[in-house]
Amino acid sequence: MWPGIAEFQNVNTIGHTDSQQRWKDAIDCGSKYGDKELLHINRQGKYNEFKICMEKKGYHRFWPAECGYQNPKWDTGKCNL
């Protein structure tokens, strides 16, 4: 499975989202750098606020099943780190 942060993809570059820019945006939206599973915002009960903030910045959140797995055999090409 892909980490939670990888499920957020820039709508203009799905599958090739700039990781550094996504981290900057995620931090602006309340996440902590390096928290790939988004545990910090989940523990604070702010996941929905985070998701809305990321959408306003031009991201689409894919469900884990839409991303597939990091294994190339099962990767759908929609998510990246």
Feature names for model-found ranges:
Residues 1-81:
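Mitochondrial intermembrane space
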